[in-house]
Amino acid sequence: MSALTPPTDMPTPTTDKITQAAMETIYLCKFRVSMDGEWLCLRELDDISLTPDPEPTHEDPNYLMANERMNLMNMAKLSIKGLIESALNLGRTLDSDYAPLQQFFVVMEHCLKHGLKAKKTFLGQNKSFWGPLELVEKLVPEAAEITASVKDLPGLKTPVGRGRAWLRLALMQKKLSEYMKALINKKELLSEFYEVNALMMEEEGAIIAGLLVGLNVIDANFCMKGEDLDSQVGVIDFSMYLKDGNSSKGSEGDGQITAILDQKNYVEELNRHLNATVNNLQTKVDLLEKSNTKLTEELAVANNRIITLQEEMERVKEESSYLLESNRKGPKQDRTAEGQALSEARKHLKEETQLRLDVEKELELQISMRQEMELAMKMLEKDVCEKQDALVSLRQQLDDLRALKHELAFKLQSSDLGVKQKSELNSRLEEKTNQMAATIKQLEQSEKDLVKQAKTLNSAANKLIPKHH
């Protein structure tokens, strides 16, 4: 791409905007990132000038954006894969000083910044990925906790720092993939913050969100207090992903460790679901106990009312018998009125008796349901205990495999040292052998010279002997 001089010396707003965009994306347009097996390849393209052309160029902006998206996706693949492998080999909880983890956050920051629209403020234009991350709490209620925690952190003063803290807390919560998927699925909300061809708006964003699921096997712990997240410079270190020709192959047992970790994560997830079920059942049991208490109180009130009605009935019977005796001599109409009052009292007593029977039946039903819930709780607690025992066993197996791995690595290192020593000894022996062979050749040559001299002396002696005779 050729660089042309602008027609005027004074920069225009359009010139500043294009120059700023070129400055931010030069690291992506300068190289093409591709995958060679599991290694990174960087292919340098033509030089790119930061001074824009006044005339339309032949470069397609959509092609450049697609190239940037592909580069970022490949970098994210390498970063996530390298982080998982190194974390499993390390075998401990990761902290903020771990280099592969730092590079992962840098790559994620570049992915979130790609195609981000600039917001106009009093100080100029500002690009921050904190705005899209704030939307997650509206889509996933569980994210409200980490958003509130980020806002409460005292040392954060810029939106960039808050976004970086949010990414770290989401990774600690093992929900980063879930949050990113929920955010990417809402393109209509993201369009307020991103350009149409940004990474978060295209298929590459969904692929990266799917790759983040693998990070749920990593345990990370970050201390946000005192860490300067506002002024950190996010530069991708390509040297971590370039192929080393002398790199050694992974030691034996990595497959078994991966299988054990998968089983461990499965058991932990199952244990979490069982705990949630136990909590739900406990809530239902509490509600049933409250309902049972209420029904017991209602039953006691009904019993008291029945006793009162029985007393009233006895009193009414006594009064009726008295009235019958007294009214035998009275008018017939009075006896009819007393009979109606007695029938109404009997009807009222029958209704109260039926109400008592219904309340007792409901109480028996609630008691049986409570017994069933208690039995289900006991079975679930037993299942949880068994799963926890299995989890402990799997962790023990994982520790044994790690110890075996370290032992094999130590033996391999010792054997490599022995082979190296033997190779050095062999080279020294070969050197001595060559020296001895050269000495033997010199001795053979000297022997030949001596034989030749002896023959010469013999012939000379033979010639001298006849002369003396």
From Swiss-Prot:
Q: What is the lineage of its organism?
A: Eukaryota, Metazoa, Chordata, Craniata, Vertebrata
Q: Which PROSITE patterns is this protein grouped with? A: RUN
Which Pfam family, any one of them, does this sequence belong to?
RUN
User: Is the Acetylation keyword given for this protein?
Assistant: no
Q: What does the record give as the function of this protein?
A: ARL8 effector that promotes the coupling of endolysosomes to dynein-dynactin for retrograde transport along microtubules. Acts by binding both GTP-bound ARL8 and dynein-dynactin. In nonneuronal cells, promotes concentration of endolysosomes in the juxtanuclear area. In hippocampal neurons, drives retrograde transport of endolysosomes from the axon to the soma. Plays a role in the generation of neuronal polarity formation and axon growth. Implicated in the formation of a single axon by developing neurons.
The molecular function terms in GO held by this entry are: dynactin binding
Where does it localize? Cytoplasm; Endomembrane system; Cell projection, Invadopodium; Cell projection, Growth cone
Which tissues express it?
Answer: Expressed in brain (at protein level).
Q: Which residues form a coiled coil?
A: 271-362, 422-463
Stored CDD domains: RUN_RUFY3
Gene Ontology CC terms, in alphabetical order: anchoring junction; cytoplasm; dendrite; endolysosome; filopodium; growth cone; lamellipodium; membrane
- Where is the PTM Phosphothreonine found along the chain? 5, 12, 51
Q: Where is the composition biased (Basic and acidic residues)?
A: 321-337
Q: What is known of its domains?
A: The second coiled coil domain is involved in the interaction with GTP-bound ARL8B.
Give the chief site where it resides. Answer: cytoplasm
Alphabetized InterPro entries for the sequence: RUFY1-3, Run_dom, Run_dom_sf, RUN_RUFY3
Name this polypeptide is given: Protein RUFY3
**Location of Phosphoserine modifications:** 34, 49
Q: Where do the record's region annotations for Disordered lie?
A: 321-342
Organism expressing this protein natively: Mus musculus
S-S bridge residues: none
- What are the entry keywords? Cell junction, Cell projection, Coiled coil, Cytoplasm, Developmental protein, Differentiation, Lysosome, Membrane, Neurogenesis, Oncogene, Phosphoprotein
